[in-house]
Amino acid sequence: MVRLPLTPAEVERGQRLGALLRRARGDRPMLDVALAAGVSPETLRKIETGRIATPAFPTIAAIADVLGLSLDELWSGVNRPAREPLAS
């Protein structure tokens, strides 16, 4: 299967997702969050840095659950217009 290159919008959305998850994780160790979500720390690191711009839904749902984020909250934070600033 050939994967199409990501669009600039998809890359930017992946970066917003990573930033949102990093903020939600706060001071919690990446290892603790990753293990609680059932993903590898490397996967979480790649998502947080935007290197995995389109992670699988179950992966994001598990991480969001561990971080106490609702999927609605996550979607609204990731899917906002590009010019809107990230919430602090």
Stretches found by the model and what they are:
Residues 27-29, 55-58:
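Residue-level signal for the short linker/turn that defines the boundary of a DNA-recognition helix
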Residues 1-27, 72:
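A short, Lys/Arg-rich alpha-helix, primarily the initiator
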Residues 19, 23, 46, 65, ...:
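DNA-binding alpha-helical recognition surfaces that contact promoter or target DNA
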Residues 58-73:
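DNA major-groove recognition helix of helix-turn-helix/homeodomain DNA-binding modules
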Residues 1-6, 75-88:
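Short, charged recognition helix plus adjacent turn
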Residues 26-46:
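Short alpha-helical DNA-recognition segment
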Residues 22, 31-32, 61:
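Residues within the helices of the helix-turn-helix
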Residues 51-56, 82-86:
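Short, solvent-exposed alpha-helical "recognition" segments
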